Amino acid sequence: MRGKRIDFKKACWLVFAIALLVRLIVCWQLSGTHSVVSPSDVTDMETYRRLALEIRQGHWPAVFDYQPFYYTLFLPAAYVFSPKGGVWPPMLLQALVGAFTCLLATHTAARLFGKTTGIIAGLLLAVSKFHVFYTPFLLLEVWFAFWTALTLYAAVRLMQKFNWKWGMLLGAACAGALLTRGNALLWTPGLAALILWRGWKRRKQMAAVIAAAAAAFIIPIAPYSIHNSLNSNKLCGASVAGGKVLSLGNSPEAPAGGLEYPRTYYAWAEDEAAGGKTVARHILDWAKSEPLVFLEQKCRALLLFWDATEIPNNVSIDVDGKASPLLRLLLPWSILGALGLFGLLVCGWKPRASRLAALWLALAFWGSTSAFYLLARFRVGFLPVLCVFAAAGIVELCRRIVQSKRIHTPRARNSLSVAAFALLFSIYVVDFAHDAYCQDLMPRVFRSLRPQGIALDLPSERVVYDHGPLGFGGGVPLELDDGSHTLGKSFRVKDGFLSESPVRQRLLLRVHHARRQFAPPGVTLRSNGEPLRPRAYWHTERSAQWLALEFTAPVRRTEDFEIVLDERGLGVFIDLQRNYGRSTLDGEALPGEWVAELVLDR
């Protein structure tokens, strides 16, 4: 006798109710936190709030620097209920949007893999820690997840029932996603290709679908693009910050994750603003000069995308989420990421149009996000897609386990073994792979790809160093014991930087817990065995504190410095993700490189 079937409609509304209740409880628990009530002026949250209130008063910005949906449409509409910018209207509306996103994930997974999978997908998203956590904050992540879920749902429906109505919904969803976050533009080529492939034998129907999708995509974007173009005197999209954002994750100094503003970011942005080379042109030139380094950076970003590590920005789940006991009980990325990757591996590769649409959106989101730079909140929009495939993976694993018990054949056992291997591989990628690469392989990789370290030829200065990114790299402070210590650091200077005549130079050494209220420590400095008389001072740059040693000397191909420090409580940073063998402490080789830079005046 078969068991009673689940009432799918009731199950969907149950998913919606659970999702909404969980989000409302977390909103209530976090409603008194500083980041909700009074976010810092330097955060995107306060910027969005300020812009929305100004727009409600009729003061529109000259250009839309950020993607404009959130602060030109959503927040002004939410503040109708609280003209002074109260916290509860946006929170309540974002809780509803999050719950509807769970409903969309449920229906999408049901159409792709069956109703049981759909219910599991909705429940996974309903209790996803990161999706719930961002609900109370004035950040666009919940909305971006909604647009991603709607894009996936519309694409699946269009592939299953090819008509202009679903094409129009798909175009509108892509427009909403693009107006919320710019990397959604990179989804569209694959979706357009799927439309052509699906409708190739029905040309008239395909033309209607393309026309409807294009109109629904262009019409919402056009007013913002026209506004930006008129005020910038050049053709622009809905946002004018694309070049700056692209440069944050695509430069010789850029980390794969974290928000860091290296020297090249400012130099390239200033060059573009002055009418010189565009940021895109700078990136292409650099990629041509160091193709393997560029490839390594992008592959590392692709790997980091799946990593369970949170890269906080604006808010941190470990800090801002402490006030919510419920949040600690929800599913973290380490579980959902592993299950989602597993589902992609075992369920995503079937040649059906609807499955291909889901697979494309998953791959396009992964690639388009990794093409820029990674923060924890950038992955929130991926969670609906992730939960759909996670649910499919769970159901498929259960099916193979049952099949292996019922059918004792080598094929059934092999099928289960493949699934088990895919699950273990997914767990390794999400929880261990990135750290293992950075700790064990990266020093050797960079010793091979970039043997001389980084050499920057900037308009105002030239810089040579061996360490990696400051914010999301391998830098750790090494506390020096009391007494005198000799730090050895060697630089390899490229030919174009050499000078026989004296040049003003600065040797920067990143320090920790420096007592800035006192004078810098006594320093003895030697270069290639010759004593120098540097001017020592504390220096703050790129959100880091440095001990600067300024002197004038010729620039040689090999600069071997010996820095003798005598200072209590001074920590000096060492980067364990780089090891060229060019750093020593008291004559002994270190397992990394000092975070030190040689800056040469032009």
Regions found by a protein language model. Give the residues of each.
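Short hydrophobic alpha-helices at membrane interfaces in multi-pass membrane enzymes
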Residues: 116-119, 154-175, 204-211
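Multi-pass, polyprenyl lipid-linked donor-dependent membrane glycosyltransferases
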Residues: 66, 70-71, 89-100, 120-155, ...
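Transmembrane-helix signature of polytopic, membrane-embedded enzymes
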Residues: 88-89, 102-127, 145-146, 160-162, ...
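Juxtamembrane membrane-water interface segments immediately following transmembrane helices
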Residues: 15, 19, 26-61, 209-274, ...
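Transmembrane alpha-helix segments characteristic
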Residues: 20, 125, 169-174, 212, ...
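Membrane-interface helix-loop-helix junctions at transmembrane boundaries of multi-pass membrane enzymes
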Residues: 4-10, 161-165, 198-212, 319-327, ...
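Short hydrophobic/aromatic helix or loop-helix immediately within or flanking a transmembrane segment
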Residues: 44-57, 61-85, 92, 96, ...
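Lumenal/periplasmic acceptor-binding loop at the mouth of the active site in multi-pass
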Residues: 57-60, 69-76, 257-344
